[in-house]
């Protein structure tokens, strides 16, 4: 299936050819705030909705209730950052089962920028806050079995996360 994210709705394209393609609604009341937050994470799709981080499975199965939001434990951080962030970036680190989301505000210095690390555990999700990363883009690369977590900044530099404390590793 192909999911189609809109600002206020989510649809699913099903079928295998032009003769049986069909677009069906997943929800007509919740959408995705920013496409850069959509990531495959732990066998599901995670995205930033207006009420925090959501999974497609939770949104589909539960409907449009708050139960579909996985970030309830840290909702105050999302509430403080969703409204006035100028951009969002996210990255998944599969071998650590982590989803990281970064909130960028044009008026804030890089060292005050906040983000959230979401870790998938057997019994749910755990969260921690990260500060000081203001990425313009993010990615992971597997090189000789090693996972490199990278982000580009707004000055044009590429930084490596997970090594050292300056991101220059």
Q: Regions from the language model: what does each represent?
A:
Residues 1-169:
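Beta-sheet-dominated scaffold domains
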């Amino acid at each position: 299936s192909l999911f189609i994210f809109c600002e206020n709705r989510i649809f699913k394209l099903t079928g295998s050819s032009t003769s049986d393609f069909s677009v069906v609604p997943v929800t007509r009341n919740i959408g995705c705030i920013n496409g850069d937050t959509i990531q495959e994470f732990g066998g599901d799709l995670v995205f930033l909705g207006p009420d925090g981080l959501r999974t497609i499975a939770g949104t589909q199965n539960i409907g449009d209730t708050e139960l579909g939001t996985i970030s309830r434990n840290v909702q105050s951080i999302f509430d403080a950052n969703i409204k006035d962030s100028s951009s969002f970036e996210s990255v998944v680190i599969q071998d650590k089962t982590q989803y990281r989301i970064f909130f960028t505000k044009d008026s804030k210095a890089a060292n005050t920028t906040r983000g959230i690390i979401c870790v998938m555990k057997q019994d749910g999700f755990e969260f921690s806050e990260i500060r000081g990363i203001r990425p313009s883009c993010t990615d992971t690369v597997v090189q000789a079995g090693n996972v490199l977590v990278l982000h580009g900044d707004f000055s044009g530099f590429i930084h490596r996360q997970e090594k050292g404390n300056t991101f220059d590793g």
